[in-house]
Each structure stands twice: as structure tokens, then as C-alpha cells.
Curated annotation (Swiss-Prot):
It is an enzyme of class 5 (isomerase). This is 1-(5-phosphoribosyl)-5-[(5-phosphoribosylamino)methylideneamino] imidazole-4-carboxamide isomerase. It catalyses: 1-(5-phospho-beta-D-ribosyl)-5-[(5-phospho-beta-D-ribosylamino)methylideneamino]imidazole-4-carboxamide = 5-[(5-phospho-1-deoxy-D-ribulos-1-ylimino)methylamino]-1-(5-phospho-beta-D-ribosyl)imidazole-4-carboxamide. Gene3D superfamilies: Aldolase class I. It comes from Nitrosomonas eutropha (strain DSM 101675 / C91 / Nm57). The gene is hisA.
Length: 248
């Protein structure tokens, strides 16, 4: 089980939002590359970047900060990136410039054929971010909830050849009130590709609970506010996950 630190970028800074609301941002650092190196030094094996401005604008907006992070990490661990990726040119640009996995969210739902084409052009490098509220998929930086069922859509995307599904429970993201483990397990059970959990990780107890169900196909968990505010110690979390892995 991978514990994956999140670096959310807004106006070139590392921030955390509550429930995806741009106006409710806490700035944690003005130099995101320093944050990336901090997690690398603490044993992170993958990083999760989000271009928040990009997610709302529908096109890349934090290019400078992303470049700085890629240069600082220098290929030592994989970087996954989402936010504002709505065309193949952007996918190709990021994958050619040090990003290991591109995460497609809104565009997977709203632009017919785009996800399918991306998976075909860049096999093994496309993940889908499914943001859920009450089992329905939300789009446009979480500002709109659609009628699409999360599991139905995930199955369809699995057939396209996506590498993994990142499942975020919007109601819990940035709120530090525990993961929606039931919904994540339900999704993982319906799929054969890996599911990465996200939204609401609070403490080691959440990591322990998630590790107990990882055999359902949950391969990682993305954490943000908890590791920045200190309710979860990143090193301890990864050590616990490794310990529970080896005990199996």
C-alpha cells in the first residue's frame, strides 16, 4: 500500500482546500518544490500533484511550479498529475516533461472519445480521477454533480485501458473526518484495475483500516491536509502500511 502525499497547486503555491472550495484554501508553502523534496526525503515513493487553477480553468495554469517540482525530484520517484487536462497535446506535453502518470477527471466524463484516445496513445500512463458525492460523479473542480454512477463509469473506463482509478469522496476531502472506506471497497470490488483512495484520511487508524481491505484492489491512498497539519505522520503511515503488507 502506497501512502501518496498530495501537493495541490494554486497560484504557484502549495495549498489545501476544504471540500474543493477554492476560496477556502490554506497555504502551506510558497515553494512547492521544497515540499516535494521534503516528502521525497521522508520516503515517499510517489507524488500526487493537482493544478487547482487548471481544474477550474480547464487548461494548465501552474506550469512553473510543476516544472520546478519535476526538476527537483529529477526522476527519482513517479509523479502523477491532474487538473485542467482536456486534450491530447497537454497529456503528451506533461508525459514528455517528467510526469509519469496523467490524471484525467472532468474531460473523461464530458469530452467523448478523449479518454479512450489518451489510453490508446499513452498506454499505462493514464489514470482517471473519479470524484464522488453520494455515489455520483462530480466534475469541473467538483462544482457540478452529474447523474453518472461512479461504478458504472469506472467499469467503462477500465475497458479503455486506464492504469488506475483515483476515488475521491468530496464530502470528506480536507475535512479530516475519516475515509469513506465502504464506497472505496465497493468500487474496487467492481473493478480489476487498481483503485487509489483519497479524501478524508485523518490518522494511522485510517491507514490500518485501509490496509485491511487492500486485497480488494486498493493499492494506495492519497493524503494531504492530515500530513501537513500533523494528525498523520507520513513516515509512520508508510512504515505501518509496509509492516501490514509484510505480515500477510
Amino acid at each position: 500500500m502506497l501512502i501518496i502525499p498530495a501537493i495541490d497547486l494554486k497560484d504557484g503555491q502549495c495549498v489545501r482546500l476544504k471540500q474543493g472550495i477554492m476560496e477556502d484554501a490554506t497555504v502551506f508553502s510558497e515553494t512547492p518544490e521544497t515540499v516535494a523534496l521534503h516528502w521525497l526525503d521522508n520516503g515517499a515513493r510517489q507524488l500526487h500533484l493537482v493544478d487547482l487553477n487548471g481544474a477550474f480553468a480547464g487548461k494548465p495554469k501552474n506550469g512553473e511550479a510543476i516544472r520546478a517540482i519535476v526538476e527537483a525530484i529529477d526522476g527519482r520517484i513517479p509523479i502523477q498529475l491532474g487538473g485542467g487536462i482536456r486534450d491530447l497535446e497537454t497529456v503528451e506535453y506533461y508525459l514528455d516533461n517528467g510526469i509519469s502518470y496523467v490524471i484525467i477527471g472532468t474531460a473523461a466524463v464530458k469530452i467523448p472519445g478523449f479518454l479512450h484516445d489518451a489510453c490508446y496513445a499513452f498506454p499505462g500512463q493514464i489514470m482517471v480521477g473519479l470524484d464522488a458525492k453520494g455515489g455520483k460523479v462530480a466534475v469541473d473542480g467538483w462544482s457540478k454533480v452529474t447523474g453518472h454512477d461512479v461504478i458504472d463509469l469506472a467499469k467503462k473506463f477500465q475497458d479503455y485501458g486506464v492504469e488506475a482509478i483515483i476515488h475521491t469522496d468530496i464530502g470528506r476531502d480536507g475535512m479530516l473526518n475519516g475515509l469513506n472506506i465502504e464506497a472505496t471497497v465497493e468500487l474496487a470490488q467492481a473493478l480489476t484495475i487498481p483503485v487509489i483512495a483519497s479524501g478524508g484520511v485523518t490518522n494511522l487508524d485510517d491507514i490500518r483500516k485501509l490496509c485491511q481491505v487492500q486485497s480488494e484492489g486498493i493499492t494506495g491512498v492519497i493524503t494531504g491536509r492530515a500530513i501537513y497539519q500533523g494528525s498523520l505522520d507520513f513516515k509512520e503511515a508508510q512504515a505501518l502500511a509496509d509492516q501490514l503488507d509484510s505480515a500477510k
